[in-house]
């Protein structure tokens, strides 16, 4: 957001997609400026020099695995509190699941100043569980599959960042969720999945 007043140009960096926050800043005379994710994540982008950098998406490393247990714990509790207590079991994903994702180079994390705030899996190529489905896929083109999206609840916009990241790597994406996961179903639909 930026507001020009006399000789001064005030710039306030706000990393929010919250409509209420945006309306508040607009009511103060500030105007929104759309910034692409690449610019936010680059070293010299709009957030450079700010006190808090935007979360960076990167491949997970072995030393990230201990931080993922609590992240997935928050996600399991969130799902249970929002009408979906059965999609992920008490300990899902298991540490060995995450280790296998890491070894295949499919596990990504949201890293903000060395703190892991979320994770997801992007699997490029055929997904065995999609070989037999009810209905039909709209395209038989090569695709990537998104699995195990989770955040710790402290950073907003992780799902949108995940989608942008995945779309830059594969033009055809597939994702699924449990029928009781209303929050994820809403997010998936909002990002153009049918």
Task: Describe each region flagged by the PLM.
Residues 5-56, 143:
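C-terminal "cap" of GNAT-fold acetyltransferases
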Residues 5-13, 168-179:
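Conserved GNAT acetyl-CoA-binding A-motif
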Residues 16-34, 160, 179-194:
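Conserved active-site alpha-helix within GNAT-family acetyltransferase domains
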Residues 56-70:
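A short beta-loop-alpha structural element at the N-terminal edge
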Residues 76-96:
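Conserved GNAT-fold acetyl-CoA-binding loop/helix
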Residues 121-154:
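Conserved acyl-donor/pantetheine-binding loop and adjacent beta-alpha core of acyl/acetyltransferases
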């Amino acid at each position: 957001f930026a507001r020009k007043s006399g000789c001064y140009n005030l710039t306030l960096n706000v990393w929010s997609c919250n409509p209420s926050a945006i309306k508040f800043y607009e009511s103060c005379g500030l105007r929104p400026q759309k910034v692409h994710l690449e610019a936010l994540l680059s070293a010299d982008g709009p957030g450079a020099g700010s006190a808090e950098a935007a979360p960076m998406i990167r491949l997970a490393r072995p030393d990230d695995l201990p931080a993922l247990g609590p992240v997935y714990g928050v996600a399991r509790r969130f799902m249970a509190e929002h009408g979906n207590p059965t999609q992920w079991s008490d300990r899902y994903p298991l540490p060995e699941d995450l280790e296998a994702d890491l070894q295949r180079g499919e596990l990504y994390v949201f890293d903000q100043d060395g703190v892991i705030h979320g994770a997801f899996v992007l699997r490029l190529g055929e997904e065995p569980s999609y070989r037999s489905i009810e209905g039909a896929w709209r395209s038989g083109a090569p695709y990537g599959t998104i699995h195990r999206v989770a955040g710790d609840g402290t950073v907003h916009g992780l799902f949108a960042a995940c989608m942008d990241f995945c779309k830059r790597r594969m033009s055809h994406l597939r994702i699924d969720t449990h029928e009781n996961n209303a929050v994820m179903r809403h997010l998936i639909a909002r990002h153009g999945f049918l």
